[in-house]
Amino acid sequence: MEGADLLTAGVLFLFAAVAAVPLAARLGIGAVLGYLLAGIAIGPWGLGFISDVDEILHFSELGVVFLMFIIGLELNPSRLWQLRRSIFGVGAAQVLLSAAVLAGLLMLADFLWQAAVVGGIGLAMSSTAMALQLMREKGMNRSESGQLGFSVLLFQDLAVIPALALVPLLAGSADEHFDWFKVAMKVLAFAVMLIGGRYLLRPVFRFIAASGVREVFTAATLLLVLSAALFMDALGLSMALGTFIAGVLLAESEYRHELENAIDPFKGLLLGLFFISVGMSLNLGVLYTHLLWVAASVVILVVIKMLTLYLLARLYGIRSSERMQFASVLSQGGEFAFVLFSTASSQRLFQGDQMALLLVTVTLSMMTTPLLMKGIDKWLSRRLNGPEENDEKPWVEDDKPQVIVVGFGRFGQVIARLLMANKMRITVLERDIGAVNLMRKYGYKVYYGDATQVELLRSAGAEAAESIVITCNEPEDTMKLVELCQQHFPHLHILARARGRVEAHELLQAGVTQFSRETFSSALELGRKTLVSLGMHPHQAQRAQLHFRRLDMRMLRELIPEHSDMVQISRAREARRELEEIFQREMQQERRQLDGWDKFE
């Protein structure tokens, strides 16, 4: 693709995303399905703006690559060892069982047994990009079902290596083309990457960070991710697996959070590009001529994978309310099928339109997942939040609460218990099914659902409530809720949890003045105790704590992100000097009088 064509394609991609995703969100079908529909619209079978789908699809795999790097950063070798049972137990069982059943069905559909085996393995894989995105949207990341889902996806990525090696063997070209020496060299190169990364990455990033130039650090991060992907691709292995390993090697480093921040903007854009490319690859011509075959294949694929996953989740001990979410989020075909089927086609394993039919099936199955998740979400909401008497029954009992608490994790539980102890009428909304079930056993009135949906807030009593307390784990969810409340329920008094200064600035800019930084108060209290342990009078330590709190809040309001770094540094130094002067005056005053105790907040 030439430079001008690449620029035109970039503009078309951005326009399609900007137009389709907000529309999809308004319709409630999710961003992923919006990207897929946008791809269909601008692809060769839609308006025909872009025809070179294969090249763009290969480039767009970088979205999955960046996503896997960030996932690797969130894990460490000890955590992977803890997940070994779910990775090599449930993950292996899912791939083998699904592949065996699907391969048998493909043989009944007149596929050669070699092609059926490859087809079964490819269809057994799920979409890492789609599943992880949906799990994040549905708040499954921290749940038991989400952890198990990640383990299954990780095993599928690991299975890429033997699956690709199996293709030439099935094609009967092992003696002519399959070079075991090359395989051994690939394994050796892979081992060198592991060992080199283990001992070299930290010193390299320490040297780069010492320069103090953030742009260079970002460039080094991109270089690491792209180099790992290119290296694995040259070996004929999964690019995503290579960057995942690089992330794991850096998971325990002091640069973990900075690396994640540097990559995050690129990940989101490239993931969107990946889903658009998948939509573009949908061959509507094959769909039109084999409509019944494709429709039946999609249904059979989704049902078989859901049944397999549901059974494994039950054997693993996942709660019944979480099994359907786990089974549905992994029910689609995945991006690995495109790679595996292309390799098999080059070995002439498929006949006629067989490869095209399989690819259309995979693409359409990916489009069913967001809709399936939405339907299961509604079913779970009604099931967990009370029996359904008629179609108009709200998801949440409307008992006209005074306060709505969103999120019932450790942070939200303390707030809810305090409010209930003071006889306040509250409604708690939580999207982690496991947490809902557990808290209900203890007698808490917790309801399942995604609070970023206006309908759920309305049925929870937002129109009659006085306040809403937002304690979401994800800052994006917090800001989305703030926007929804300001737009649809402007009378609500909004109180929110901020994970740090960045989130606090965002809340202030959105007009939310009542918030709490989750570690700030506890850190101040421990600091006060430290001052007392060093010999300071308790009254003086208390006043020091209060002065620090007030000055820090004032700085938070003044040092908004628009200021330059130099202005922020200058103002921070000025504030530190001001704080020291206040403490000096307090010291002199306390020496004169330490009898009385002032009223403190």
Curated annotation (Swiss-Prot):
One GO term (biological process): proton transmembrane transport
Topology versus the membrane: Multi-pass membrane protein
Location in the cell: Cell inner membrane
Keyword check for Ribosomal protein: no
GO CC aspect terms: plasma membrane
Entry's transmembrane regions: 4-24, 29-49, 55-75, 87-107, 111-131, 152-172, 177-197, 207-227, 230-250, 262-282, 284-304, 324-344, 356-376
Span of domain RCK N-terminal: 400-519
Any one GO MF annotation of this record: glutathione-regulated potassium exporter activity
Major location (coarse): membrane
Keywords recorded for this protein, A-Z: Antiport, Cell inner membrane, Cell membrane, Ion transport, Membrane, Potassium, Potassium transport, Transmembrane, Transmembrane helix, Transport
Function recorded in the entry: Pore-forming subunit of a potassium efflux system that confers protection against electrophiles. Catalyzes K(+)/H(+) antiport.
PANTHER family associated with the record: K(+) EFFLUX ANTIPORTER 3, CHLOROPLASTIC (PTHR46157:SF4)
Family: Belongs to the monovalent cation:proton antiporter 2 (CPA2) transporter (TC 2.A.37) family. KefB subfamily.
Name assigned to this protein: Glutathione-regulated potassium-efflux system protein KefB
Native species: Salmonella dublin (strain CT_02021853)
Gene: kefB
